[in-house]
Amino acid sequence: MDEFDRRSWWMPAPDEAAWALPDDLRAVDPLSGRDCGWVNQMRPFVRHFSRPGEQVFDPFCGFGSTLLAAALEGRNAHGMEIDAARAQLARTRLARHAVAAPVVVGSLADIAPAAPIDLCLTNVPYFGCHWHGDVLPGQLYASSDYASYLTGMRAVFHALRKQMRPDGVGVAMVLVVVGGRVIPQAWDLGRILASLFTLREERVLCYRRPAATLAHAKTQSDRSHEYALIFQHCRARLDLQQAAQLLQAVQAQGLPVVVHGSYARWLASPTSVPEGPADLDLMLRGEQALWDRLTLWLQQQGFALSLWGEPCRAPVALAVVRAHHYLRAERIGADGRRLQVDLQLPVDEPPLP
């Protein structure tokens, strides 16, 4: 049986016939079960990132492969599935294995899960899969465009952050979809996860396929691999030296920023924040010219700006900042050191027209 180790890639063993999706269930699915994940691809992650009796959760549980894998490893499991027909297929499949794992119908963005979450393990829905089932709000398979697909994906993982236990681990498996050109689904999902969690690592799962010839200068592949993106519900500690230097430099620019949040509490009393501040939170009054000066200066210092994980460039309209509650600036040095700054308007600022 495969074990999770330091290998950056491996080839999961195909499922034993006993664990495969039964033909009668496959036959009634809108996609004929072609997107059903393997139980064996999930089991090494279950063993490595959870302990017996803990709760394994799949927010896109589909046919219940993750839940079955968790049960086989002695874990508790529960899932969510937005398509009611697929949720029933998962329940039927699990019942045939005498697995008691609740499957809630709905989206995690709208509905709370059935139990706490120690490990989130999932295959995310593919973009552009030509869904033939019921089209419901939040059904990512039915997304009409890539931007709305990514927005929906972010909503689910943002909700996950509120439900996951501190230091809990998540694994999201995703393909780089091709349709004549690459759609960087794995990297875009990684960007979303990195904005919400600490993105730790990746593994590449490869699946054996028969070799096939390719005409000269053609590029098509059999797409026989997927990425497992590993993230954790924790925040990296703030680099205190970099934060102090940046704050000094901002103040030297004559910008009237106000420090708040965990860094302000730490400055006032380091013992009150024994784990250290999580990030550098700065407030700046709602004058567009001041915000433009600060954000343009930060860009010149090597900071990348983003709104809820979406890259942006200065100047950024204050109405947009208010709608997102904060503007993030992050710099990654060549030595790997990171500095993250969250810029906010004062909470008592009047609404902008």
Regions found by a protein language model. Give the residues of each.
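Class I S-adenosyl-L-methionine-dependent methyltransferase catalytic core
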Residues: 1-237
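Short, conserved active-site loop motifs that form the nucleotide-linked donor/cofactor pocket
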Residues: 100-102, 280, 341
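A cross-domain feature marking catalytic cores of carbohydrate-active enzymes
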Residues: 124, 174, 203, 261, ...
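Short, solvent-exposed loop/turn segments at secondary-structure junctions
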Residues: 126-127, 176-178, 234-236, 264-266, ...
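Short glycine-aromatic motifs
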Residues: 197, 257, 298-305
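Active-site beta-strand termini and strand-to-loop segments that position acidic
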Residues: 231-234, 285, 329-336
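Active-site nucleotide-donor binding segment shared across nucleotidyl transfer reactions
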Residues: 246-280, 284-295
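Conserved catalytic core of two-metal-ion nucleotidyltransferases
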Residues: 301-349
